[in-house]
Each structure stands twice: as structure tokens, then as C-alpha cells.
Amino acid sequence: MATATEQWVLVEMVQALYEAPAYHLILEGILILWIIRLLFSKTYKLQERSDLTVKEKEELIEEWQPEPLVPPVPKDHPALNYNIVSGPPSHKIVVNGKECINFASFNFLGLLDNPRVKAAALASLKKYGVGTCGPRGFYGTFDVHLDLEDRLAKFMKTEEAIIYSYGFATIASAIPAYSKRGDIVFVDRAACFAIQKGLQASRSDIKLFKHNDMADLERLLKEQEIEDQKNPRKARVTRRFIVVEGLYMNTGTICPLPELVKLKYKYKARIFLEESLSFGVLGEHGRGVTEHYGINIDDIDLISANMENALASIGGFCCGRSFVIDHQRLSGQGYCFSASLPPLLAAAAIEALNIMEENPGIFAVLKEKCRQIHKALQGISGLKVVGESLSPAFHLQLEESTGSREQDVRLLQEIVDQCMDRSIALTQARYLEKEEKCLPPPSIRVVVTVEQTAEELERAASTIKEVAQAVLL
């Protein structure tokens, strides 16, 4: 039956071919030949290319104007007008040959130039040498690294800790180690740049909530809960993370951790807490925002911090439950593929921890000095203080913007320069403006340390007031 049908179709096709008009057949034949030519012919013929004469080549070379490798940089760009520091940036700092009181470095506990810390680093230098020349998995693990991890875990009262050789890479590596494509991350709009890079590397679905606005965060969590109900199968394999800072670098404010913990359990999310500014600052013993609020540290899934602020060393660490930390030893990019922390810096961090444990009163001293300068800086005409009174790093922003970010930056830099002329070292907060997710307003960043005396704090506040009045009014 099928054979008869096929024969009938073939007969019909032949009959249609005979009955077709001649012009129709000619047109189809031309099209078929043209298609064959296009398939088998080259896109160009070598003989059709005419060689240029030497004179023509020279003219083309002279006319050619290459595009610049980098965009033009204005002469007043900060990268071209940097300050040169001589000696350690501790309590007093020598900038461009001028000695100033340091209100710019994150040396909160004054350990950067501490004799005990330097002695520990020197002893380690004599024992181990300068560096390790290898990552932790390839002969880069020294006993001092394990000692530091053990000390950090005990200090933070967690099961385990892991150290990284670069502070920025700590949270930027930890986030993509857990959060992957398809997962959902709820993050504060004021999150620091290291968190932003970690989120970018994770390729997760990012949802921004207003700074420290728990109502806005819950709104996003509820919306996600509704979406999960529409597709339960996908929801079962989608992980949800909340990423916040204990003390925000860009605002100087403390996160509302108790409310975050409630939302965590209510909506079944995990909390990543970045404590680079709050570690060694908040809490009775400097354990950070969990101790500040009296929160059980087991309620936080992962805590990270760098050791470049309070500990006055280099690198960073993560701490938490053992199974959480062990995962990073194979998945943390900054841990697996970077040379391990130089032993001398690990030894310095251990000695800094010893000092913190031996002198818990140092944290109360720091808080009191923070309150003093916050109070002294209130009421500056043209400037407003941004940050909480407990924060040793806060911002001075213009009360009213000029409408131009460039002009705002110039005004604030003029204040910084005139303060330096009066031996008060400040700095503007700098950002990669084109890469920031939510670019903060221009500001002067002020840093308080335990080494600054009450008289120096008052002097700095009065100097800033006088200079601001002269520049802004």
C-alpha cells in the first residue's frame, strides 16, 4: 500500500513539472545554481586584492591615530596626587614630611606599632623566613597558621576557623563558596565592595534591601516565599542567604542583628555576617556584634572578618561550625589558590589576640573616645556626622550637595588638605565609582583609636569645624 502511494506521489510531481511554465523552471534553475555557487565559492578572490604602493602605505601609517590605551586622566586625579608616608602609620604619622595626628588608619586598638607585636613578628621572621611561597594545600601550611586558626576559633567561641592571606579576598571567596547560580541572596544596599565582588562571583540572584530596613527585607522575603509556593520543586533546591555587615564600612552604622536572626528562622534563610570593622571593637571582649547584642553565635551561619584593622596584621578569617569551615578548604578560591599568610604576620596576629584577651578594658576606652569625638563634631555648619557613636570609623558628609559629585569631592578634599596643614591627617572615602552597586555620597572618613588623647580628639574636632567653616561658608 505504501509503495503504491509513493509511486502515485512521484507521478504527480513529474506531471506538475511538465505542466509548469518555462519561466518558472528557468527561475528555479537559476536560484539553485546561485545557491550552489554561494556554497562553494570563496568570500574573496586573492587576485581581486590590489597591493598598495610604498607611498600609499606610508600615507596610511601617517594618518593612523591609535586610540588611547586608557581614558584621559585629569591632573587632579587622586592617583596622580598621592601622599607619601614615612614610618609606621600609628598614633603619629609622617605624611609628605609633615608629622600629623593619625585619624585615617584603621589601627583601632593601637597595636600596629606595639613592641610585643613587633617582637613576635621578628621572632617568627628569624624562625620561618619572610613568606611561604605556596598555598595551604601545597606545603604552605605552617604550624603557626594552625595555632592562629585555633586561637581565633576559641576567641570567637566557634568550632573552627580558617585564615586567608588577604582580607578583601576573605568574604569575596566565602560567599561564592556556598552561594551558586540559582541561589538567592538578600543583601543590604550599603554592603562594602568586598561583599559586592563576592556576590558577583557567585552568579546568584541578588535582591537588595534598604539599609538596615528590616521591613523592606521582610517584604522581599515574603515575595520570595510566594514565588517558592508556585514552584515547590525548585524551592527545595534553592538556598536563601542574608548577607550583612556587623558595622558598615560605608555608613558607620550597626546592623540590627536580633531582628535579622528572627527573620532567618521565620523564612528559613542563612546569615553571613561580615565583621571586619566590628571585630575587636564591639562587645565587652571585642568579639563583635554578636557579643554586642548578646546573640548566640551559633545563630549565625558564617562570620568573616579581616585581621587588618583591630589586629593590625594582614589577611582575614572565617569562623563557624566545622562542616561550614571545612567546605572552604576546598571551595574558597582565595584559600586554595593564593600563597598562605606569611608566618610573621600570623605570629603578629596571635600576639595581638593575647593583648586583647589580657586587656579587655581597652574596648571600653575605645568606645568612650568614639562617643567623645562624635559629640564634639556635632553642629558643624555645612557638614553632618554619619555613623553611630560607638563606631570608631564614621563619615562627615555635606549637609547639602552642590549638585555635582566632582564639586562635592573638591570641597571635601580642600577640608582634608587644610586639616593636614594643621597636623590632622584625614582622608576621603574612595570608591570605584563605576563598579559600585549603590554609590555612597562623597565623605571624609574619620577614624578613632585608643592612642588618641582627649586633648587630641578635641583639637581635631575644633580644627575640622574651623576649616569647614572657612571652606563651605
Curated annotation (Swiss-Prot):
Gene Ontology process terms (BP): ceramide biosynthetic process; regulation of fat cell apoptotic process; sphingolipid metabolic process; sphingosine biosynthetic process
SUPFAM superfamilies from the UniProt entry: PLP-dependent transferases
GO terms for cellular component: endoplasmic reticulum membrane; serine palmitoyltransferase complex
Compartment(s): Endoplasmic reticulum membrane
Pathway it works in: Lipid metabolism; sphingolipid metabolism
InterPro entries, sorted: Aminotransferase_I/II_large, AON_synthase_class-II, PyrdxlP-dep_Trfase, PyrdxlP-dep_Trfase_major, PyrdxlP-dep_Trfase_small
Transmembrane segments: 16-36
Catalytic reaction equation(s): L-serine + hexadecanoyl-CoA + H(+) = 3-oxosphinganine + CO2 + CoA; octadecanoyl-CoA + L-serine + H(+) = 3-oxoeicosasphinganine + CO2 + CoA; tetradecanoyl-CoA + L-serine + H(+) = 3-oxohexadecasphinganine + CO2 + CoA; dodecanoyl-CoA + L-serine + H(+) = 3-oxotetradecasphinganine + CO2 + CoA
GO-annotated molecular function: pyridoxal phosphate binding; serine C-palmitoyltransferase activity
Chain positions with Phosphotyrosine modification: 164
Entry comment on modification after translation: Phosphorylation at Tyr-164 inhibits activity and promotes cell survival.
Chain spans, region Interaction with SPTLC2: 1-66
Topological domains annotated Cytoplasmic: 37-473
Lumenal compartment residues: 1-15
Main subcellular location of this protein, as a coarse class: endoplasmic reticulum
Keyword set, alphabetical order: Acyltransferase, Endoplasmic reticulum, Lipid metabolism, Membrane, Phosphoprotein, Pyridoxal phosphate, Sphingolipid metabolism, Transferase, Transmembrane, Transmembrane helix
Gene3D superfamilies, sorted: Aspartate Aminotransferase, domain 1 (3.90.1150.10), Type I PLP-dependent aspartate aminotransferase-like (Major domain) (3.40.640.10)
Domain notes: The transmembrane domain is involved in the interaction with ORMDL3.
Similarity comment text for this entry: Belongs to the class-II pyridoxal-phosphate-dependent aminotransferase family.
Subunit description: Component of the serine palmitoyltransferase (SPT) complex, which is also composed of SPTLC2 or SPTLC3 and SPTSSA or SPTSSB. The heterodimer with SPTLC2 or SPTLC3 forms the catalytic core of the enzyme, while SPTSSA or SPTSSB subunits determine substrate specificity. SPT also interacts with ORMDL proteins, especially ORMDL3, which negatively regulate SPT activity in the presence of ceramides. Forms dimers of heterodimers with SPTLC2. Interacts with RTN4.
Protein name: Serine palmitoyltransferase 1
Source organism: Macaca fascicularis
Gene for this chain: SPTLC1
